[in-house]
């Protein structure tokens, strides 16, 4: 990401007031942020959000849940507007980093139809457009079991949105297409030929969403993966074991197909609050096929909103090791030990890496809207991973369960 561009974006509040007055307040500046402390009760692994390189262990960390965002909107005329959004948060480089979340031109074709061109949010979740805006959400953070399953937050391309009322129900359909490169812990994931369809039905306090996304995934700078793929191919050729070469092709992530299907429901009726999502991920590479879901329920008591969430991530399918247990008689002495090492590495794939693994989480929390545009949240998660689950930097012997606590102050301006 070009730091100079983002620095200019984040400096907009210093330079646009005069411009806004001169142009009849055409430029609008808004922002959001979260100041948080996060900790856990286990020092053998770290808890972090998706795309973070480090997280909280048995110490207090500000970077896991804290962020600051700024958005600038400029209305050129009644059919064209420009939007840019910058976000500062702890990222895959193990420190606070700046990113350009959105940067698009919006063309209003009619009252029902609009087109955006540039960097737009990728509509794959119930709260895709405001997942980083803590104040807009009941929970302190989106459940990682679901929201870790797609590494892309935005797409460089375009989307088209069509909205129509049918009696008391409003239907919104959104189709996005493009490509993006997303940094993760020590490597990048590239998605090309991304196509995402998002359909939302709203009726009173209820919102139903259905989505489908597909892409071609490439991971070409992950050292451990490249070493394994190269070793399998070398062993396959050197020991005349073609199944190893075939296995290397199955593991390698190079223009591999991937799909993500999801459905979600929200309700805010009287004092009851409900939010739930169910998702299925499938890929033709080393990345696991998964099922993930969560259900959150809460009840509003004055300015307080206590809530409970149950979330789960399960592996449906993963790479199966076809490495032989031993080499045939007469092969070099080093052959069987080599196969044993390769087999162990292949078997570790389903439970290691970003967005891999299985886990369940029980969450209790409370939101307190004690002032205008400001909310205080306290949340405790009890996480039961299978293996490492979604924890990062796990040490030998880590197993869980782990308790994670956080206090956050969300605000918008």
What does each model-identified segment do?
Residues 1-4:
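Positively charged n-region of N-terminal signal peptides that target proteins for export
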Residues 6, 10-15, 19-61, 218-221, ...:
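Outer-membrane beta-barrel biogenesis signature
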Residues 10, 45-48, 130-133, 391-393:
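Short, glycine/charged-enriched secondary-structure capping and boundary segments
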Residues 11, 20, 59-61, 73, ...:
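Residues embedded in well-ordered secondary-structure elements
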Residues 24, 61-65, 95-100, 151-153, ...:
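Transmembrane beta-barrel outer-membrane domains
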Residues 25-40, 59-183, 191-215, 299-316:
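Outer membrane beta-barrel
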Residues 42-44, 56-57, 104-108, 214, ...:
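Outer-membrane beta-barrel pore domains
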Residues 130-142, 224-237:
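Short, flexible helix-coil linker/hinge segments at the edges of structured domains or between repeats
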């Amino acid at each position: 990401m070009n730091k100079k561009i983002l620095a200019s974006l984040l400096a907009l509040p210093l330079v646009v007031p005069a411009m806004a007055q001169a142009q009849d307040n055409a430029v609008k500046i808004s922002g959001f942020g979260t100041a948080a402390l996060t900790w856990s009760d286990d020092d053998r692994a770290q808890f972090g959000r998706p795309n973070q390189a480090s997280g909280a262990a048995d110490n207090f960390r500000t970077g896991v849940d804290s962020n600051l965002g700024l958005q600038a909107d400029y209305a050129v005329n009644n059919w064209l507007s420009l939007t840019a959004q910058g976000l500062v948060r702890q990222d895959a480089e193990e420190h606070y980093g700046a990113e350009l979340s959105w940067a698009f031109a919006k063309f209003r074709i009619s009252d029902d139809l609009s087109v955006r061109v540039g960097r737009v949010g990728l509509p794959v979740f119930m709260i895709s457009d405001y997942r980083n805006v803590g104040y807009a959400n009941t929970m302190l953070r989106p459940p990682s079991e679901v929201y870790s399953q797609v590494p892309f937050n935005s797409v460089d391309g375009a989307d088209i949105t069509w909205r129509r009322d049918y009696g008391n129900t409003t239907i919104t359909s959104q189709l996005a297409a493009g490509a993006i490169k997303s940094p993760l812990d020590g490597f990048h994931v590239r998605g090309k030929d991304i196509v995402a369809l998002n359909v939302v039905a709203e009726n009173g306090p209820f919102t139903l969403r259905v989505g489908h996304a597909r892409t071609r995934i490439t991971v070409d700078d992950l050292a451990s993966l490249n070493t394994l793929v190269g070793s399998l191919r070398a062993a396959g050729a050197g020991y005349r074991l073609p199944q190893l070469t075939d296995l290397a092709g199955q593991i390698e992530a190079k223009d591999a197909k991937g799909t993500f299907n999801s459905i979600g429901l929200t309700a805010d009726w009287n004092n009851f609050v409900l939010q739930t999502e169910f998702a299925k991920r499938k890929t033709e590479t080393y990345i696991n096929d998964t099922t993930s879901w969560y259900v959150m329920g809460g009840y509003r008591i004055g300015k307080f909103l206590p809530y409970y969430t149950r979330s789960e991530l399960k592996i449906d399918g993963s790479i199966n090791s076809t490495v032989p247990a031993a080499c045939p008689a007469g092969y070099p002495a080093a052959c069987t030990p080599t196969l044993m090492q390769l087999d162990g590495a292949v078997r570790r794939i389903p439970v290691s890496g970003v967005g891999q693994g299985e886990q369940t989480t029980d969450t209790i929390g409370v939101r307190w809207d004690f002032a205008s545009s400001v909310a205080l949240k306290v949340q405790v998660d009890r996480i039961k991973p299978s293996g490492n689950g979604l924890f990062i930097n796990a040490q030998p012997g880590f197993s869980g369960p782990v308790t994670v606590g956080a206090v956050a102050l969300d605000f918008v301006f």
